[in-house]
Amino acid sequence: MESPTAKLRFGYVEKMGKRYVQKYFLNEDGSDISWRAFEKHFTKKYKKTRRKRNDILFYTHGFRAHKDAYQDITNYNMHKGLYECKDNSYKTIISLVWHSNLNYKAMRGKTIEMGERFAGIINVLLDVSKEKKSKRKVSFLNHSMGNRIFEGIFTELQSLRKNNKPYIENVIFAAPDIEASTFYKDGTLEHIDRFCNHAIVYRHKRDLTLSMSKLINLKDRLGLDGIDDFTKIPTNVYLIDVSSAKKTEDNHDKISRHGYYTSSPVVRQDIFNILNPKKAKPYPIRTILDHPKNLSIQDVEEKDNKKKLRR
């Protein structure tokens, strides 16, 4: 049996009044259902959907974010501000939940292996969903240390599927607590262009949480330090600087500047535009910095935007 600090779970969200509560698929005795049982449940439910397109988003949270209080805030912001939007085609949201204790370094050392374990069932779900909806798209949204989980998922999926052409639409790296060198030669994600069509990294230059991580790891963090040389990384990678986005719906984020992917309306809208390019709003406008794929966004009002900048 897994220890509580190594538990991997598939979650779903249930609306209870004004709250969006994280739930899990359980047996009658309160234990988690097996992954095989989850596969059967997913297959049955996905097959019944009437939409021609029912795109899938795998979401992976960060360190200690399996806690109910954090999940409540995240679920509320993301459902109200993104998932439930009328034009959002990603109607199947699968939460990859991993339990962690307070030992940051110890948990960080386990995350790649956790991701590799998740990859086995994800691989099955990719095939099941493709069989049921041939035109469905799949994307990943990862936050903070959840991006380390994704690195494990990526490594194992590439081994299982042995694809040289992208089979995932988007991978969104929100405030990634991983090495800034991950896309460079010999980095874990050196071949991300064989995995997805678009790899989008959000960074904040004053991310307090990642500043602390940098001190602990003694290495640059992708979500803090960004990318130095775009000529040495895959061409499908974009970097979006959100340091100028001040508005937040979470008081805690005013200090940490780390959870903007859920609390910042302008960042949520940018994520919506990435996932739904045909229904994208003309805002936020992306400003090109020193490279066409090094961009920034800032808080703006809808009425002030008159044109749409395509990816």
What feature does the model see in each segment?
Residues 54-62:
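Short beta-strand element of the alpha/beta-hydrolase
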Residues 1-50, 63-65, 71, 75, ...:
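Lipolytic serine-hydrolase domain surface
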Residues 55-56, 136-138:
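Generic beta-sheet signal
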Residues 118, 142-146, 150:
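Gly/Ala-rich beta-loop-alpha elbow adjacent to hydrolase catalytic centers
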Residues 67-68, 148:
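Loop/helix-junction capping segments adjacent to catalytic residues or to phosphate/diphosphate-binding pockets
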